Regions:
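N-terminal secretory signal peptides that target proteins for export/translocation
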Residues: 1-28
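Cap/insert and terminal regions of metallo-dependent hydrolase folds
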Residues: 255-258, 264-269, 275-375
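N-terminal signal peptide c-region/cleavage motif recognized by signal peptidases
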Residues: 45-47
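Short His-Asn-centered micro-motif
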Residues: 89, 271-272
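Sec-dependent signal peptide recognition
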Residues: 28-36
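Binuclear metal-dependent hydrolase catalytic cores
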Residues: 3, 7, 11, 50-258, ...
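Hydrophobic helical h-region of N-terminal Sec-dependent signal peptides
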Residues: 35-43
Length: 382
C-alpha cells in the first residue's frame, strides 16, 4: 500500500464488540467503507490498554462548541498512555466518559495539558475534577493541570461589530488557575454537603492547577501578534515523559499552545487549534506522530450563509478560516516538520464525510490517519 493512502485506523476503535472482531466483521465492514471511498485501509485488532511502552488514545475527535448529532464523534480530547500512566490533552464534551471507556482508571491520570481555554477544549474538566473522589483517594491520585495563564487586555472589537461587550469584567481573560478555582467555587454547595454528611474526600487534595508562563520577552502585544516566532520551552518532566510547549496562532486567542511529548518509545505533537504555523513546524520537527486539527472549507461556506456576507458573517468566516487549518494545510505542516505520521483530529465539522479530509494526502506523502473516537495508535513504528 502506498504511504500516501489514508489509513482509517492503525488500530480499531476499542469499543467495538469482540465477537464482531473475531468473526472478521469489522475488517470486512471497514474494508468496504474504505473501498467505497477509494481509500486503502490498514486494519488491525483493537489493542488493550498498554501495560508498558506508549500509545496515543484519541478520546474524542470533534472540534467546536456544538452538537453534530448522535452518531458524531465526542468532543476533542486525547490521552498519551505511557507505562500505564495517562497524560491528557484537552477535555472536550464527553471526555470523562471516553476516558473510562478507554480503560483509563481514576488515578492513572498524571497531568492535563490544556491547549487553550475555548469551551470545546475544557467543558469536561469539571467532570474529571469532581467525579470518583473515593477511587482517587484509593489510588493516591495527584493530578497536575497545566494550561494558559491570564490573557491580559482584551482584543479590540472585530471590524463591523457594534458595542463593547465584556463578560466578567473583574477578570475577563481568566487563566487555568482561575478556571479550576471557579469550578471548585461553583460546586461548593455539593462538595460541602458530601464532605460533611457522607464522608466523601475533599477533592481539592487530588489536583493542582498551574498557569504556564510564556518566556519573558517573547510576546510584545498579544492583540498584534499572539504567537510570534519563538523556541519551544519545557513545561513538564517526569520519569516517563518530557512535555514542551510553543505558542501557535488561533485568531486572537492568547495564550494558545501546541504541545510535544517525548518518551522512550517515541514522540507525539498536538497542534491544538492553530492556523498554519512556523512555530508548530518547529515544535514537531522529526516527531513520530503529529496530531493536527482540520476544518472543512465547504462547511464554513455553508454555516456562514449565502454571500454577500454582512459584518457579522465576515467576522465568523474570518475566525473559522484564518484561525484553523484545512486538510491540505495540515498535510503541509506535517511535510515541513518531517513527521512520520499525520493524525487528523479536532475535525470541524465532526460529521463531515470522510472523503472531505482526504485532501491532506495532496501535501503529505506519509501515512495519514483519520482520527476516530477511541482509536489507539502505538508510538513505536510497527
Amino acid at each position: 500500500m502506498s504511504e500516501a493512502h489514508m489509513r482509517f485506523a492503525d488500530v480499531a476503535p476499542a469499543s467495538l464488540p469482540a465477537r464482531r472482531l473475531a468473526a472478521g466483521g469489522l475488517r470486512r465492514w471497514l474494508g468496504r467503507a474504505a473501498a467505497a471511498l477509494g481509500v486503502a485501509a490498514l486494519l488491525a485488532a483493537p489493542a488493550a490498554q498498554a501495560a508498558d511502552g506508549a500509545e496515543l488514545v484519541l478520546l474524542g475527535v470533534a472540534g467546536g462548541p456544538t452538537w453534530y448529532g448522535n452518531d458524531a464523534p465526542h468532543g476533542i480530547s486525547s490521552a498519551l498512555v505511557v507505562d500505564g500512566k495517562a497524560y491528557l490533552v484537552d477535555l472536550g464534551s464527553g471526555a470523562y466518559r471516553q476516558l473510562r471507556r478507554a480503560g483509563i482508571k481514576p488515578g492513572a491520570e498524571q497531568a492535563v495539558f490544556l491547549t487553550h481555554l475555548h469551551t470545546d477544549h475544557i467543558i469536561d474538566l469539571a467532570s474529571l475534577l469532581m467525579y470518583d473522589p473515593s477511587a482517587r483517594r484509593r489510588a493516591k491520585a495527584s493530578l497536575q493541570i497545566y494550561g494558559p495563564g491570564r490573557r491580559g487586555a482584551l482584543p479590540p472589537l472585530a471590524p463591523g461589530l457594534a458595542g463593547d461587550p465584556v463578560i466578567h469584567a473583574e477578570n475577563p481573560g481568566a487563566g487555568t488557575v482561575d478556571l479550576v478555582d471557579s469550578v471548585v467555587a461553583g460546586m461548593a454547595a455539593d462538595l460541602n454537603i458530601r464532605v460533611r454528611s457522607e464522608g466523601v474526600p475533599d477533592v481539592r487534595g487530588f489536583f493542582q492547577a498551574h498557569d504556564i508562563v510564556v518566556p519573558a520577552g517573547v510576546v510584545k502585544d498579544p492583540n498584534v501578534d499572539p504567537a510570534p516566532p519563538m523556541e519551544p520551552f519545557e513545561v513538564w518532566r517526569d520519569e516517563r515523559v518530557t512535555v514542551s510547549a510553543i505558542l501557535v496562532p488561533h485568531g486572537l486567542v492568547y495564550p494558545n499552545f501546541a504541545y510535544r511529548f517525548d518518551t522512550a518509545s517515541g514522540s507525539v505533537v498536538f497542534s491544538g487549534d492553530t492556523a498554519l504555523s512556523p512555530n508548530l513546524v518547529k515544535l514537531a520537527r522529526g516527531a513520530d506522530i503529529l496530531v493536527h486539527e482540520a476544518i472543512d472549507p465547504a462547511w464554513v461556506d455553508h454555516i456562514v450563509g449565502p454571500k454577500p456576507w454582512d459584518a457579522r458573517q465576515q467576522a465568523l468566516a474570518r475566525q473559522l478560516l484564518e484561525a484553523h487549518t484545512t486538510p491540505q494545510q495540515a498535510g503541509e505542516a506535517a511535510t515541513r516538520a518531517g513527521v512520520r505520521k499525520l493524525v487528523l483530529s479536532h475535525l470541524v465539522p465532526g460529521d463531515a464525510p470522510a472523503e472531505h479530509w482526504l485532501h491532506a494526502r495532496e501535501t503529505f506523502k506519509g501515512p495519514v490517519v483519520l482520527g476516530q473516537d477511541l482509536m489507539r495508535i502505538p508510538l513505536k513504528q510497527p
